[in-house]
Amino acid sequence: MEKNTSQTIFSNFFLLLLLSSCVSAQLRTGFYQNSCPNVETIVRNAVRQKFQQTFVTAPATLRLFFHDCFVRGCDASIMIASPSERDHPDDMSLAGDGFDTVVKAKQAVDSNPNCRNKVSCADILALATREVVVLTGGPSYPVELGRRDGRISTKASVQSQLPQPEFNLNQLNGMFSRHGLSQTDMIALSGAHTIGFAHCGKMSKRIYNFSPTTRIDPSINRGYVVQLKQMCPIGVDVRIAINMDPTSPRTFDNAYFKNLQQGKGLFTSDQILFTDQRSRSTVNSFANSEGAFRQAFITAITKLGRVGVLTGNAGEIRRDCSRVN
């Protein structure tokens, strides 16, 4: 009896290991080596050209990748035109330059006869994300490929799937852990806010109406409050965009974490990473060592790129990223 029980436990353990490695085994670097060997160069050139037109290309593409992966997995469902995920309020603020970056890169890839209709929009978005990180001074990293494009994109599927500006650490960890991402991964990915921007309407409560007894969030730097009030005065258009990193907003560096140490996190969900003792040591580590942040970011963005992917014969290779075939 004990022997059979041991065999069953071992079999179940082996099955779990097999399932957990399944996605990463199907995604791999060099996936298009035979079908479209120059895909990475083609995407790189297209993204660089778009980036030269507007810096917004970088934060917009990064945010687009994150939003895509957290809703139905990294399947480019965010790219599908309305009615779709893009109709949800959490996605309506996504900058058009992110979508345009993927469209331009897809056009460049498909203009090569050897590559036409062979590379998924999901993979192009993953590659474009790496390129904007590099273009802003961040680390380069190998991108696993082999994703297929999803056929489903609905407004309802976005509900409660994306982190909110007022989230506390428990809420952040809970949401990220559902996708196999650790607290360290979450903090590293939050570091991408170093080149991010946000709209006045998303943070004004912290500086004008934080609580019934306290107008200003006590965790926010008072000098930073003055700056924010100048950029987002009462009555301003809530869509006005401001940088999330007030020191080096166009450079992918560890300044975001140094800002948190000074109380200069734009969102509650940013500043909580430092004010909560459970995550403070990681923030301090990344603030003290850009190398530590860069390595953690590479690990986290790679894991993010594996979330909910479609591979093999699942999904499709979309001819037009904005609509299913």
Swiss-Prot record:
CDD domains: secretory_peroxidase (cd00693). The active site is at residue 67. Binds 1 heme b (iron(II)-protoporphyrin IX) group per subunit. It is found in: Secreted. Induction: Up-regulated transiently by a cold treatment. Induced by methyl jasmonate, a plant defense-related signaling molecule. It catalyses: 2 a phenolic donor + H2O2 = 2 a phenolic radical donor + 2 H2O. Substrate binds at residue 163. Disulfide bonds join 36-115, 69-74, 121-321, 200-232. Slightly expressed in roots. GO terms for biological process: hydrogen peroxide catabolic process; response to oxidative stress. Pfam families: peroxidase (PF00141). The record marks 63 as: Transition state stabilizer. Its EC number is 1.11.1.7. Its cofactor is heme b; Ca(2+). GO terms for molecular function: heme binding; lactoperoxidase activity; metal ion binding. Ca(2+) 2 binds at residues 194, 245, 248, 253. SUPFAM superfamilies: Heme-dependent peroxidases. Ca(2+) 1 binds at residues 68, 71, 73, 75, 77. Removal of H(2)O(2), oxidation of toxic reductants, biosynthesis and degradation of lignin, suberization, auxin catabolism, response to environmental stresses such as wounding, pathogen attack and oxidative stress. These functions might be dependent on each isozyme/isoform in each plant tissue. This is Peroxidase 45. It comes from Arabidopsis thaliana (Mouse-ear cress).
